[in-house]
Design a protein with these regions (language model features):
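Active-site regions of metal-assisted phosphoester/phosphodiester hydrolases
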Residues: 1-134
Length: 134
């Protein structure tokens, strides 16, 4: 999701909701196992009224397809109040956000870890999410 999507054509928005709708046939029906993971470049903290690409809308849409955010499911944290950041803007530790997610359906996640800033900042402004499944 970002403004750079326009280079692929005027009809390409780069919005996560549009990508989910485009690929939803790949996700299978509600009984199939599936994982959607990566940098969503979005958080409920930036939601603005009336914006279709609000993260709350994205999360609700994924939930309607049978997906759940494994971080929030396992840690019992609410969106926008995450205790572990996944992104450090301009690689600064104090500019931290949670914008990377692992959503799954019909899987049993056991544990989800986020790589520590100190070990990963050399490689990326994002920390990896590592999930163990049953």
């Amino acid at each position: 999701y970002n403004h750079r999507a326009r280079k692929f054509g005027a009809e390409v928005s780069g919005n996560t909701i549009d990508a989910i709708n485009f690929y939803k046939d790949w996700f299978g029906d509600k009984n199939e196992k599936c994982i959607i993971a990566g940098d969503f470049n979005n958080s409920i903290i930036w939601d603005k009224k009336g914006n279709d690409n609000n993260f709350d809308n994205i999360n609700n849409h994924l939930m309607s397809l049978g997906f759940a955010s494994n971080y929030h499911k396992l840690r019992g944290e609410i969106f926008g109040k995450e205790s572990s950041p996944t992104f450090f803007h301009t690689k600064k530790e104090h500019k931290k956000y949670h914008i990377d997610y692992i959503y799954s359906k019909n899987l049993n996640p056991l544990e989800l870890k986020i790589g520590p800033y100190s070990e990963w900042i050399t490689f990326s402004d994002h920390s990896p999410l590592i999930m163990d499944l049953d």
